[in-house]
Amino acid sequence: HGYGLTAIMGLTLSQVEALMVGTKTWIANLNAETQIVIAGADEEMAEVAKRALAKGASKAPRLAVSVPSHCELLAKPAQTLVEAFSRVTLSRPRYAYLSGSTGRVLWQPERIADDLAMNMARTVRWQEAVISANEREARLAIEMPPGGVLTCLTRQAAWEGESISLDRSGIDVAVHLAQRLRA
């Protein structure tokens, strides 16, 4: 308790980083050019949010999560997953694995295992990942439940395809779009 995430909207990464100086907060998500999510203790995030609003951020809400995801505060549990993956045999994937923390496709099983295990302790580069998927001509993004935030963020990131939330659109719409795009 006492930890989580705060979204800073309306400021760039460099502006948010400058506001974080002297606090124990971390960049958690790079969702869009001017939507940066920070992680940390509630008081520290509140201070950064206050500074952000004073510098012209349009919003700086504390998100409804109690985990400081995608930052070094979760390095220890991530390391536990690294150790678990060391006991699993992985093969090269048949389909491209797009990393949210690098925004790049990974093919090597050991790099994919590291990415999956360490994801909770690394910054998510959502916008870069969406751009990378777009460059590879992916044309359908389906957000799994719950929610629809990623669907909206995908549309904002120069996405040229369809983007839907299963929560909001349902499986029938997803199947229809997949079939239409395959034809």
Question: How would you label these PLM feature ranges?
Answer:
Residues R87-A183:
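Acyltransferase/transacylase module recognition
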Residues H1-R122:
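Alpha/beta catalytic cores of group-transfer enzymes, especially the acyltransferase/condensing modules
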